[in-house]
Amino acid sequence: MKANPPLAWHPVPVSAPVNLRWWLMHQESLTRLLQAHCEHFRVEPVFQTLATACIDELEVMNLRRQNQVLVREVYLRCNETPVVFAHSIVKKEHLRGAWRGLSRLGNRSLGTMLFTNPLIQRTPLAFKKLKPHHPLFERACKQLQMRPINLWARRSLFILLRQPILVTEVFLPAIHQL
């Protein structure tokens, strides 16, 4: 049996802890789900710039290594505790098209926009256990007091007018307290 390459994302989070699987597999808006589970919810923007995509994002976004994308990263906080690190990328040229408002979201939820527009289509979720060498693991851990051994993430494409945005959500240890 052939081993999965280290960059692979999987259609099912088979080895994820049972109490995390429910969060990972939830198909609707993660923003709305978190809002229902905490008294105070907020989006904290931490990074937004034009950059190159992570190596495991290139194929799914049909990018070359040198292509510029808008990278937006935020923490989703429940009662001031970061519970999810969200990372989204969109091709630079699509910022003048379907995703033109993305660069001005600020502390507003991208999820709210994605799940209220009936023209946006979502691809199936993919899952990965992120290890410390993965760039998203490193960035997700910046505000954590203790670094975990690994972090589970999920991602999917949202497509508007044939223009995709890739949204990756990294679940932080505090999610278990909700």
Curated annotation (Swiss-Prot):
Record-level GO BP terms: pyruvate biosynthetic process; ubiquinone biosynthetic process
Gene designation: ubiC
EC annotation from Swiss-Prot or TrEMBL: 4.1.3.40
Organismal lineage: Bacteria, Pseudomonadati, Pseudomonadota, Betaproteobacteria, Nitrosomonadales
Localization per record: Cytoplasm
Role of this protein: Removes the pyruvyl group from chorismate, with concomitant aromatization of the ring, to provide 4-hydroxybenzoate (4HB) for the ubiquinone pathway.
Keyword annotations: Cytoplasm, Lyase, Pyruvate, Ubiquinone biosynthesis
Pathway stated in the Swiss-Prot or TrEMBL entry: Cofactor biosynthesis; ubiquinone biosynthesis
Keyword field contains Cell cycle: no
GO cellular component, one term: cytosol
Family from the record: Belongs to the UbiC family.
InterPro entries (alphabetical): Chorismate--pyruvate_lyase (IPR007440), Chorismate_lyase_/UTRA_dom_sf (IPR028978)
Name of protein: Probable chorismate pyruvate-lyase
Classification via Gene3D superfamilies: Chorismate lyase-like
Highest taxon, organism lineage: Bacteria
Origin species: Nitrosomonas eutropha (strain DSM 101675 / C91 / Nm57)
GO MF annotation, one: chorismate lyase activity
